[in-house]
């Protein structure tokens, strides 16, 4: 592949990555505490969309804080996994073969 062709392919890949990032803003990921008293929804780009807290948790600030930390960490981990998997797939699919760069996305 010539240099101009590679540059064109890289621009195409960049656009596909940007399109994927926009699409990931619409992918919702849910997580809840083990007992279902706290529910959090984020996008695959790790933006919090909603938090639902059962009234019983409002009586114990420390417990609520613990629930928030644990549940937020879980949902962010899930979102990060989806995000990385989707962006990696786009990059792998469209990256031109550049000598010496074979292991870049492994």
From Swiss-Prot:
Q: Does the keyword DNA-binding apply?
A: yes
Location relative to the cell: Cytoplasm, Nucleoid
> Gene3D superfamilies annotated for this entry?
Nucleoid-associated protein YbaB-like domain
Q: Which GO terms describe its molecular function?
A: DNA binding
Is the DNA-binding keyword given for this protein? yes
For this UniProt record, give its keywords in alphabetical order, as a comma-separated list. Cytoplasm, DNA-binding
Q: Which SUPFAM superfamilies match?
A: YbaB-like
The entry's cellular-component GO terms read:
bacterial nucleoid; cytoplasm
What does the subunit comment say?
A: Homodimer.
Check the record and name the NCBIfam families matching this protein.
DNA_YbaB_EbfC
Q: Tell me the function of this protein.
A: Binds to DNA and alters its conformation. May be involved in regulation of gene expression, nucleoid organization and DNA protection.
Q: Which family does it belong to?
A: Belongs to the YbaB/EbfC family.
Q: Could you tell me what this protein is called?
A: Nucleoid-associated protein Fjoh_2555
- State the species of origin: Flavobacterium johnsoniae (strain ATCC 17061 / DSM 2064 / JCM 8514 / BCRC 14874 / CCUG 350202 / NBRC 14942 / NCIMB 11054 / UW101) (Cytophaga johnsonae)
């Amino acid at each position: 592949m010539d240099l101009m062709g590679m540059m064109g392919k890289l621009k195409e890949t960049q656009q596909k990555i940007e399109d994927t990032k926009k699409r990931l803003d619409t992918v919702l990921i849910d997580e809840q505490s083990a007992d279902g008293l706290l529910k959090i929804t984020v996008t695959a780009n790790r933006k919090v969309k909603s938090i639902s807290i059962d009234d019983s948790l409002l009586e114990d600030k420390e417990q609520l804080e613990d629930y928030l930390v644990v549940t937020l960490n879980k949902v962010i981990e899930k979102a990060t996994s989806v995000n990385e998997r989707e962006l990696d797939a786009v990059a792998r699919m469209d990256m031109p073969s550049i000598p010496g760069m074979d292991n870049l996305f492994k």
